[in-house]
Amino acid sequence: MKTKIISLFFVLVLTLSACGSGFAFQRNLDKWEAQNIGHYQFTVAVSCFCPFANVEVTYEVLNGQVVNQSIQSSPDNPVDEAQVSDFYQSYNTIEKVFDYVGDAINKADETNIEYDPTYGFPTNITVDWIKLAVDDEMYLTLSNFEPLS
């Protein structure tokens, strides 16, 4: 009996934590969409066990389309800009970042998402797709957000 109660408790905690992630996601997506910001720029950095870890890319977005990008890498670690653009394509607009986060919340074993308190977009994203796997974690950081006129 005690084992069943403990098991039920853990199921309830996991269910509520998943709902909390989904609720925070929807609340912040609604906040972002209510801002109706059609022209903005931001910087994204991805950290993972991948070829372009720790490369920062700044995007200018106009009406959902990337109109400018700037790739920052160190001189001792040059990168192929076309490959970086392709790799970062899923994160090159705030809307795509929300798509990525929504997918991660629904499919990954573990997520931790922090949101900008003013605009609602995700700022720090940690995704562990398979908890027991090694080197599948993804970390995204969005910074330097600026609405443009």
Model-predicted segments: where are they?
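Bacterial N-terminal signal peptides that target proteins for export
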Residues: M1-L8
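C-terminal motif of bacterial Sec signal peptides marking the signal peptidase cleavage site
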Residues: T15-A18
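A short, structured loop/turn motif at beta-sheet edges
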Residues: E33, E60-V67, P117-T118
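Short, surface-exposed coil-to-beta transition loops
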Residues: F52-V57, D135-L140
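Short, structured surface segments that line ligand/substrate-binding pockets
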Residues: F98-A133
